[in-house]
């Protein structure tokens, strides 16, 4: 098993990841009891998995699963806003953030493997009940996890994390073409989605006040993408995303049968997963609470305080301590 090393960038990203400040603050009642955020690693199947953790060890668990091209860093402000009440845990997938980057020759990058590792991660941490926050890639990882542990999901929070065909619109036309094209030229066409311009647009498109979005977010994400070999990992994941769509009927059956208390907090201006994908959840979860927020894909960046308040209210009503 090999890991990619990026020396000086490691130091810069580590500094940025632990810096304070951001787009929002914890609610006043939480500030006095804010818990420190710990930055830890655990070995799962010989792979070092990095995770952030905060909150009382005996509190209800909230598992945060990040999207592309980000990492647990996207939750840097949400974690302290919730950790007075909950044990908040946010891991990085292999190839993302501070987790190890195993070589593609020895590790199959895909959503099934990610879900398997997160399942083992929870076992290692002795967690058998958890609320689930899913965003972007976190949705298929989290819902695959839910299929493995159907009785352990205490609540669901979907923030621009899709599970319906209605949410796969114009942005997905070239991606679907890539699914059907196994040629090198088809793969090369997707490299435009790994540029700084593409990463920046994920953060800024659909945001009214762009000055609220920390530019470190897209710069750090891009530095991590630009590590040797990592772009190939992302192209593998773009291809593998089709396996998530194939599982949509199973996800929907889980929703209908288990009826987890659900909050849908969705940046309504998201060009990747538009609000049609948010509304589609109501077909299988008619009791879900839907909040369409005036933001884009990474809604925590500019509307984090609003989302944190929604989560505190929702979990306060739905979870028993």
Question: Where on the chain are the PLM-derived regions?
Answer:
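N-terminal secretory signal peptides and thylakoid transit peptides that target proteins
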Residues: 2-19
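C-terminal segment of classical bacterial N-terminal signal peptides
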Residues: 21-27
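Flexible "cap/lid" subdomain of the alpha/beta-hydrolase fold that forms the substrate-access gate
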Residues: 31-38, 46-49, 54-57, 61, ...
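Structural cue for short, hydrophobic secondary-structure segments
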Residues: 64-67, 90
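Active-site glycine-rich loops that stabilize anionic/oxyanionic intermediates
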Residues: 67-70, 136
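Serine-hydrolase catalytic-loop signature spanning alpha/beta hydrolases and amidase-signature enzymes
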Residues: 69-77, 88
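A short, Lys/Arg-enriched amphipathic alpha-helix followed by its capping loop at the start of a domain
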Residues: 77-86, 124
């Amino acid at each position: 098993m090999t890991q990619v090393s990026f020396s000086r960038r490691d130091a810069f990203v580590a500094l940025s990841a632990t810096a304070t400040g951001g787009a929002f603050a914890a609610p006043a009642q939480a500030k006095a009891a804010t818990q420190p955020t710990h930055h830890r690693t655990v070995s799962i199947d010989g792979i070092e998995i990095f995770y952030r953790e905060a909150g009382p060890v005996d509190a209800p668990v909230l598992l945060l699963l990040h999207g592309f091209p980000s990492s647990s860093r996207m939750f840097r402000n949400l974690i302290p806003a919730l950790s007075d009440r909950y044990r908040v845990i946010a891991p990085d997938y292999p190839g993302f953030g501070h987790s190890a980057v195993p070589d593609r020759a020895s590790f199959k990058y895909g959503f099934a493997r990610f879900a398997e590792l997160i399942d083992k991660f929870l076992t290692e941490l002795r967690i058998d009940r958890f609320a689930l926050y899913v965003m972007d890639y976190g949705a298929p990882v989290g819902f695959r996890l839910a299929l493995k542990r159907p009785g352990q999901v205490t609540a669901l929070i979907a923030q621009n994390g899709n599970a319906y065909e209605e949410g796969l619109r114009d942005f997905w036309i070239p991606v679907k073409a890539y699914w059907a094209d196994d040629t090198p030229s088809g793969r090369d066409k997707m490299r435009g989605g790994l540029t700084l311009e593409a990463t920046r647009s994920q953060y800024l498109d659909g945001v009214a006040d762009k000055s609220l979005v920390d530019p470190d977010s897209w710069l750090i994400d891009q530095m991590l993408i630009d590590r040797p070999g990592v772009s190939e990992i992302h192209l593998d994941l773009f291809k593998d995303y089709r396996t998530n769509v194939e599982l949509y009927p199973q996800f929907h059956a889980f929703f209908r049968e288990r009826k987890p208390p659900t909050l849908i907090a969705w940046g309504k201006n998201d060009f990747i997963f538009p609000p049609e994908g948010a509304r589609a959840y109501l077909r299988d979860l008619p009791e879900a609470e839907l909040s369409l927020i005036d933001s884009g894909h990474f809604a925590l960046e500019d509307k984090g305080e609003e989302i944190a308040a929604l989560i505190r209210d929702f979990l306060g009503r739905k979870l028993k301590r």
